């Protein structure tokens, strides 16, 4: 039972355990075991203690031997062995450990709460890295979760023996001394408590614990009323963060901040000094989750490799202002590159990051972003600026040495019905992303930069969207795209259903326009060529307004065994067009220009399907097997649409899903004529827990009429597939060996030509319980593309040639796809993994990308070394094939866990893009 002493409550809160007599009111010249007294508090608040009746029968414990400073019976301080300022003989200094834990304190590092892996519980193993030989486990102790402020918390004290000198007001404790106040606990072999100064002196195996932190030392001074402490020859541990280190002395402030003099910081195991930060002054703030250090050297195996006058680093996963890990690179067009990001934790709901990027060959690129989160919105602003000192592109068209980028991404809701969205990126010149990298979140390299803002209203049965969308070209190898300025859509369903009928409507009013570039393009060598926009001819040069109305009525009928949905749809489209003189003079065969065009097309369809299932057993496992046949009839009469330009329309890629669409074109500028009957069937194998083991679908369409409606310049009579009576067979297959193994395939076979139109097969393996293992094997083939050829200004069916035979930049089958892709990350021995990818183009007999290397991963650091070959794309010509060239590089990435990446951020980038499952592997890694 603990007794409370009111006399000392104000300055020295103290509770005495049943095994100790402390603050004895009578001056004694001898020490006795506390177990021999019965103590209680008198009415005046003083102690009332009397010897137990059987005291004489009990052997007293031996008097503790004081190795260093002790308090004598007359209150004087004596020294036995060494002076107070020196370490006792045989004590190892932390500076002699060279970044490792002190084995002299415990051979198994148990003094740092280190628990070997084989002794961890299942729950502790789940929180421990796969390559860690153990973990720091904070022992359960009384008061560890006590939230009482130090000034209000009583003190609990325990020891094997004690004495108290009343005149000097000093209590001496010896033998397994334990003092606890609030959440803080201090252990030592002996202690001297000075009541008048509220100060304690502790010696021998000192351990201070508080809020997931442990400090171990040889001796310590403790301020009893505030919890301030100084521990000499100290080692420390932050359990949850797996952080440890040492210092000549460690100070714990009243607010629990830890300050280290000539200290170290690492996440490595106690017996490892793979890397450490060593600084004159290190501060660790558990309240904020960050630390700082001055005059810092990064040491590898106790060898200094990097110096910085100041560093700011995380000690857990919370946000805080400060420098982020730098990135260092060399080579390429930018030369030596150094990025030193600085993070501003401005508020819980908004922050900012500055990315100064020094490039030896270009200068200083200043880039930054600001992120915000409100009750109804989220987003970010970003920008970058560089006065480019590299003049390689000074002769190229559209280049500007003053290079900049701005970006705004926003999603918000004014209330539950009104939504706003902004995605806007602009750059100074089309070569920006080819020459410069960006660290901004959500900004990616693409040929067309989106510049869009929209306002959406969601009603109970409809939605209305006001949209403005433009594109900025980030390439010179594409024609200028159309902008939607503005676009208004209204789509919904009428709220009543007479006789089960369903009335839907889709409406759109939009303005399409673009400013085509004229004149010549100058490449980096000063050579002149015609701009690609000059190849655009006829109605393709038109701007205009489009109004599209598409009401429909259907009768959905659903049963447990199937469904039947007849549907009638009517599409009316009105155009108001503008066409320049060049367009009028270059009309394609059959085209006629009229400023006003309209089109009306009825669409009739019947969609139906049945559902059969049965219980079955396959290789000893129970399944629910389904058979789902589907029949879809579509009739769309032919309407001449030759005089209508194509603003946002292309032909859909053929696959199993396209068999059941009511328009073979995407967009509203073409409504494909069709009289067809599509047949398909799907077979599934489903386990009792809902896991779909495999799925197989096959289908084909029967055509009763030719498909005469085509894209501009394409003649249906020249297309075998437009005159065929049947479509290709469309197959889809997926098999999951388990939740770790997956195989996907699609295959389209043309029975007329007896050839494959397109196909792919992909095998993916990544165990849920061990995501470090990744295997991908895939093959793709496609030769049925319908695309727009920028070099000729014409739509091309199949083949995929770039340009025309005889032209200077002609490349046969440039767009034809016939590739395999193999990638793997596989542990070969503990801590070592193989990393590899090989992507090969059979059509052009070239390797697109290949890399191979290894990864070493342990408890506190990771390294990757990768040799890579890839096809680089750097635009100096409008002809895309001419801008491709092979490149090679050896890439090194080093990650110090708990500190961040030292170098090699680009390795992470191309591994993420090239290996499916890599990001999941990293997200789940310890």
From Swiss-Prot:
GO cellular component terms, A-Z: cell outer membrane; transporter complex
Taxonomic source organism: Pseudomonas syringae pv. syringae (strain B728a)
Lineage: Bacteria, Pseudomonadati, Pseudomonadota, Gammaproteobacteria, Pseudomonadales
Stated name of the protein: LPS-assembly protein LptD
Pfam families (alphabetical): LptD, LptD_N
Localisation per UniProt entry: Cell outer membrane
Protein family per UniProt: Belongs to the LptD family.
Signal peptide: 1-22
Low complexity compositional bias, start-end: 68-91
């Amino acid at each position: 039972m603990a007794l409370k002493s009111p006399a000392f409550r104000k300055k020295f809160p103290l509770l005495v355990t049943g095994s100790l007599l402390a603050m004895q009111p009578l001056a004694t010249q001898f020490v006795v075991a506390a177990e021999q007294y019965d103590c209680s508090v008198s009415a005046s608040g003083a102690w009332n203690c009397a010897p137990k009746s059987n005291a004489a029968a009990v052997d007293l414990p031996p008097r503790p031997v004081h190795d260093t400073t002790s308090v004598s019976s007359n209150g004087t301080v004596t020294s036995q062995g060494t002076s107070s300022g020196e370490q006792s003989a045989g004590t190892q200094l932390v500076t002699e450990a060279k970044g490792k834990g002190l084995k002299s304190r415990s051979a198994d590092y148990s003094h740092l709460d280190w628990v070997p892996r084989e002794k961890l519980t299942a729950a502790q193993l789940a929180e421990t890295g796969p390559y860690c030989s153990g973990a720091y486990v904070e022992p359960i102790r009384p008061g560890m979760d006590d939230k009482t402020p130090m000034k209000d918390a009583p003190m609990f004290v325990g020891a094997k023996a004690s004495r108290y000198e009343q005149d000097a007001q000093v209590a001496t404790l010896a033998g397994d001394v334990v003092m606890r106040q609030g959440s803080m606990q201090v252990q030592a072999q002996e202690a001297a408590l000075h009541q008048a100064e509220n100060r304690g002196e502790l010696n021998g195996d000192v351990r201070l614990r508080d809020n997931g932190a442990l400090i171990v030392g040889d001796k310590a001074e403790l301020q009893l009323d505030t919890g301030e402490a100084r521990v000499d020859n100290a080692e420390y541990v932050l359990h949850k963060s797996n952080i440890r280190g040492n210092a000549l002395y460690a100070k714990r402030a009243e607010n629990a901040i830890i300050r280290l003099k000539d200290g170290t910081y690492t996440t490595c195991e106690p017996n490892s000094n793979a890397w450490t930060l060593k600084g004159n002054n290190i501060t660790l703030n558990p309240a904020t989750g960050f630390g700082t250090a001055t005059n810092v050297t990064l040491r590898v195996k106790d060898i200094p490799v990097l110096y910085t006058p100041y560093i700011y680093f995380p000690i857990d996963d919370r946000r805080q202002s400060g420098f982020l890990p730098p990135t260092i690179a060399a080579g390429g067009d930018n030369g030596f590159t150094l990025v030193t990001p600085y993070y501003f934790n401005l508020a819980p709901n908004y922050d900012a990051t500055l990315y100064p990027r020094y490039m030896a060959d270009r200068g200083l690129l200043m880039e930054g972003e600001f992120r915000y989160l409100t009750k109804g919105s989220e987003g970010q602003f970003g920008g970058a600026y560089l006065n480019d000192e590299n003049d390689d592109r000074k002769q190229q068209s559209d280049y500007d040495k003053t290079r900049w980028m701005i970006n705004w991404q926003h999603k918000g809701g004014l209330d539950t019905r009104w939504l706003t969205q902004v995605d806007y990126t602009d750059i100074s010149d089309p070569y920006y992303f080819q020459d410069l990298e960006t660290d901004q979140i959500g900004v990616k390299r693409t040929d067309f930069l989106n510049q869009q803002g929209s306002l959406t209203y969601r009603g109970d049965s409809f939605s209305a969207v006001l949209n403005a969308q433009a594109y900025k070209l980030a390439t010179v190898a594409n024609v200028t795209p159309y902008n939607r300025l503005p676009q208004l859509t209204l789509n919904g369903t009428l709220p009543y259903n007479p006789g089960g009928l369903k009335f839907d409507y889709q409406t759109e009013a939009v303005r399409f326009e673009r400013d085509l570039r004229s004149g010549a393009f100058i490449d980096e060598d000063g050579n002149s060529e015609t701009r690609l926009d000059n190849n655009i001819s006829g109605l393709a040069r038109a701007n205009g307004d489009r109004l599209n109305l598409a009401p429909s009525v259907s009768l959905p009928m659903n049963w447990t065994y199937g469904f039947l949905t007849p549907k009638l749809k009517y599409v009316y489209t009105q155009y108001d067009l503008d066409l320049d003189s060049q367009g009028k003079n270059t009309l394609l065969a059959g085209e006629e220009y009229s400023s006003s065009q309209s089109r009306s097309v009825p669409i009739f369809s019947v969609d139906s399907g049945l559902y059969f299932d049965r219980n079955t057993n396959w290789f000893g496992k129970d399944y629910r097997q389904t058979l789902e046949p589907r029949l879809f009839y579509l009739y769309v009469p032919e309407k001449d649409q030759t005089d209508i330009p194509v603003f946002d329309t292309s032909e859909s890629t053929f696959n199993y899903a396209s068999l059941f669409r009511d328009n073979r074109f995407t967009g509203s500028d073409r409504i494909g004529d069709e009289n067809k009957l599509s047949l398909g069937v799907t077979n599934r194998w489903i386990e009792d827990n809902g896991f779909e083991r495999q799925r197989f679908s096959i289908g084909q369409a029967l055509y009763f009429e030719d498909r005469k409606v085509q894209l501009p310049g394409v003649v249906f009579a020249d297309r075998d597939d437009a005159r065929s009576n049947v479509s290709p067979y469309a197959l889809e297959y997926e098999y999951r060996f388990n939740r770790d193994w997956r195989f996907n395939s699609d295959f389209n076979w043309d029975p007329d030509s007896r050839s494959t139109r397109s196909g792919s097969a992909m095998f993916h393996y990544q165990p849920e319980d061990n995501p470090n293992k990744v295997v991908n094997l895939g093959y793709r083939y496609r030769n049925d593309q319908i695309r727009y050829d920028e070099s000729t200004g014409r739509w091309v069916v199949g083949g995929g040639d770039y340009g025309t035979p005889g032209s200077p930049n002609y490349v046969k089958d440039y767009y034809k796809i016939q590739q395999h892709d193999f990638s793997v990350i596989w542990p070969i021995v503990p801590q070592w993994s193989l990393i590899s990818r090989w992507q090969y183009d059979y059509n052009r007999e070239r390797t697109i990308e290949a890399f191979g290397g290894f990864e070493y991963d342990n408890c506190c650091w990771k390294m990757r070394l990768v040799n890579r070959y890839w096809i680089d794309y750097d635009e100096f010509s409008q002809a895309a094939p001419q801008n491709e060239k092979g490149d090679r590089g050896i890439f090194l990435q080093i990650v110090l866990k708990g500190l961040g990446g030292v170098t090699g951020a680009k390795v992470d980038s191309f591994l993420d893009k090239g290996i499916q499952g890599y990001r999941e592997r990293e997200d789940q890694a310890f």
